């Protein structure tokens, strides 16, 4: 059953490529490169990840290719996560239009936090210290908590219909995402506390270990459709 679910991700390749094509040809996209470029990167990398998914912890893949490697995926994801969170914060500042100074200032915390989360994720991979995944994911809770709170703060402003719709979408997304992320953080905590291998891991900045894990992130992978290798159901 899980095998079909993973293979079904390929549908996402088609939908994302269609969205990319529509964005570039049909939709009346903005000329603002700070909006357009992050959006194109996000859609393109989303299509790539649907075709070459990988689980960072188990290094499980569905296509045995270097393109499925943890390193390649994480490198692309680092770029896309920083750029699209910048885009989110940029949109908040556009909507705010200098009305609330605290919105402009706090929106930059989203960008700072996503950069911090990247360090935790790369630390988990290159130092083989999987506890860092918790702090990476906690960072995402912080990011979208800020996004939601700032959106609520701006809902009473005199906004255009388009901007008001974006604010509502932000709030609804936050209302759905934040409780789910709390459950996700609890599942990560449970995995850390019940997995003897993770509990045995030590924080070690040894350069030889970093080199070894770097090579492992490129070369090591296993084709698996076992739900346990993908974080379970």
Predicted feature locations:
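First transmembrane helix
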Residues: 2-29
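C-terminal transmembrane-bundle signature of multipass membrane proteins
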Residues: 11-21, 148-233
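Internal transmembrane alpha-helix with an interfacial aromatic "cap," most often the third helix
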Residues: 21-27, 48-57, 76-107, 115-125, ...
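Membrane-interfacial loop-to-transmembrane alpha-helix junctions, especially the N-terminal start
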Residues: 29-41, 98-111, 161-169
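Lipid-exposed faces of alpha-helical membrane segments in multi-pass integral membrane proteins
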Residues: 37-48, 79-82, 109-116, 142, ...
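Helix-loop junctions on the outward
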Residues: 44-72
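Short aromatic-rich membrane-water interface segments that cap or initiate transmembrane helices
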Residues: 66-79, 228
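Eukaryote-biased recognition of C-terminal alpha-helical segments
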Residues: 128-140
């Amino acid at each position: 059953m899980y095998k079909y679910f993973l293979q079904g991700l390929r549908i996402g390749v088609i939908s994302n490529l269609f969205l990319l094509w529509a964005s570039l040809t049909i939709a009346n996209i903005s000329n603002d490169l700070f909006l357009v470029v992050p959006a194109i990167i996000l859609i393109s990398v989303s299509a790539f990840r649907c075709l070459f998914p990988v689980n960072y912890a188990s290094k499980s893949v569905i296509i045995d290719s270097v393109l499925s490697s943890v390193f390649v995926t994480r490198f692309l994801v680092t770029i896309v996560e920083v750029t699209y969170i910048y885009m989110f914060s940029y949109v908040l500042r556009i909507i705010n239009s200098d009305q609330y100074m605290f919105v402009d200032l706090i929106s930059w915390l989203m960008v700072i936090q996503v950069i911090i989360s990247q360090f935790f994720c790369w630390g988990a991979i290159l130092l083989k210290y999987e506890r860092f995944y918790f702090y990476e994911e906690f960072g995402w809770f912080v990011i979208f908590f800020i996004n939601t709170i700032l959106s609520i703060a701006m809902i009473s402003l005199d906004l255009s219909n388009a901007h008001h719709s974006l604010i509502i979408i932000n709030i609804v997304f936050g209302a759905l995402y934040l409780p789910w992320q709390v459950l996700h953080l609890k599942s990560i905590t449970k995995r850390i506390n019940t997995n003897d291998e993770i509990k045995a891991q030590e924080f070690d900045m040894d350069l030889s270990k970093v080199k070894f894990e770097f090579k492992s992130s490129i070369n090591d992978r296993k084709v698996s459709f076992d739900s346990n290798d993908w974080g379970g159901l």
